[in-house]
Amino acid sequence: IVYNANHLFGFFSLFNGDALRSVELVKGGFPSRYGGRLSSVIDLNMKEGNNKKFAGEVGIGLISSRAVFEGPIVKGKSSFMISGRRTYLDALAQPLIMAASQGANAGYFFYDFNAKANYILSEKDKLYVSGYFGRDKFYFNQNTANTKFKTNFGWGNRTLTARWNHQINPKMFANASAIYSHYDLSINVLQKDANSDEFELKYTSNINDYGVKYDLDYRPNPKHMVRTGFSTINHQFSPSAIVLKVGTNFNLDRKMSVINTYESGVYIEDQWRERKWNFYPGVRISHYVVDKTQYLKPEPRMSFAYNVRKDIAIKGSYALMNQYIHLLSSTGIGLPTDLWVPATTNVKPMQSQQWATGIAKDFKKGFSLSLEGYYKTMNHVITYKEGASFLLQDNFFDPSVSVNNKAWESQVTSGRGWSYGSEVFLQKQVGKLSGWVGYTLSWTQLQFDAVNNGIKYYAKYDRRHDASVVCIYRLSKLFTASMTWVYGTGNAITMPQGYLRGTGHYPTTMPEIWDPSNQAFNNEMIDYGKRNSFRMAAYHRMDIGLQFKKEKAHGIKTWELSVYNVYNRFNPFFYYGQLNDAGTIRTLKQVTLFPIIPSLSWTYKFR
């Protein structure tokens, strides 16, 4: 379980393809074995490692490097797999990033590691141990005539899983797992003015999960596959730890106590095949405990598929799901900040109901086409109240007063949401030319009595249009050309209409310039207009690549020439407001991380 499934807020996949054996994306028709979330599920299986001989792959490029190694620990009985990657766009692309970001100095990099070991205990027993560690780093520096400003964002996941696989009999298998997961976010802000006055803010937040699960698969006959099991997780939330310094006059060190919650679930599901029909009925019962409050929620699931002909199939599904962890997202301009908080006695868990239907058809020459539609309702979603933030809790900046670890509840409000749309996907899998074209038309709206005068508005991640085109052309056995184009409607954000200084939330003077962190931490009193009434510019880009492979006696060498963002689109990562030297006029600025970036890489796969 990971809390941030992407690098750089969705620009890169969190998962290294070199370490994966299979990936399954579940967008609808959720099986009962999945719980705890309202949205799509990505089910990953890592490579087990070669238990016969040592093998691997090493890639070195201008913007990133990667490596994967696998081999036997005890030949024929146990094996290992380890992989890692690291980008260094921040170093090589710095001049391009500064030009695209209107002079601001911004940079980003990430690194991650995957490892797995497995051991065959007996003919019926296997033991697996796997782990993941990943970290993202983003920085933004800006100098004006009067001030110097620096901010650093860091966030990361790490997981560790031990799994025992046991064959009870030829028709029944069991998996018992112990799971640890950690997520943390840190933000550092430092500002100096011409008089050497300093403002410094350090913020950290983290979650630790300790869980166990047991899954049992039973196939009584070829038509049925019954799955059942249970899981329980202890979530330990550390909502925030803050160090605040304003000059030499004020020093605040706040650390909230840990919030312990317990989430459990038991499920049963069946895969039933009958001629042209496939049925997938199931139910999950979820249970959640926080302090002295308990929630017990049934979650019925049902999906089906019907093969009209060999080349045409239709499907439909219904799922009710509950989520006991809330994601609080910033809504205005500035750095995108997402904070995880638990359901409590006063903040109820989210619940959704989703209906989906679709049709798929296979054509000649390897073409396939699918069309799907969905409708989802959501209850008890939360957002910040107007002008609120995680730090503006009662007495938060008074060192003499203790702060309750649930004081943030006063800064949020609960409401409803709706999400609906349709997707079309055309794919070609055979021949010299392969690839796909995908398009999604969707709407996501929210409504809160205490926000936007109770009027519905579009959610931050409402994306009206989302399109992707991927083409792979095999010129020969040695040469392959590729092209990717993506497009997405910009995020909906709230644009400030005006600003007031000296709110009294800080005990001394405020920072002299407005900066991206002010939106995140609300260091100014902001006059907001309608919620999420402004759209960031659309995100789109084209990437091209050319690969040349050459087989050697002990492996394959690959040279790749690629260009990221071919037409040099300045896609916005975030906006911020900048005061002029006189401090009287604000200008909206844009930070772009990745303009056009050419790259050359070399990969060697040995076997």
Which stretches of residues belong to each language-model region?
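Short acidic/polar hinge/loop motifs at secondary-structure boundaries
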Residues: 2-25
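Surface-exposed extracellular loop regions of Gram-negative outer-membrane beta-barrel proteins
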Residues: 137, 184, 238-246, 292, ...
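Gram-negative outer-membrane beta-barrel transporters
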Residues: 375-377, 396-397, 402-495
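N-terminal periplasmic accessory domains that precede
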Residues: 9-13, 28, 33-55, 67
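Transmembrane beta-barrel wall of Gram-negative outer-membrane proteins
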Residues: 61-86, 100-137, 152-180, 220-223
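Outer-membrane beta-barrel signature, preferentially recognizing the C-terminal barrel domain
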Residues: 149-167, 255-261, 322-379, 397-423, ...
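Transmembrane beta-barrel strands of outer-membrane/channel proteins
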Residues: 56-62, 82-88, 129-135, 176-182, ...
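C-terminal beta-signal and adjacent terminal beta-strands/loops
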Residues: 379, 478, 487-523, 535-543, ...
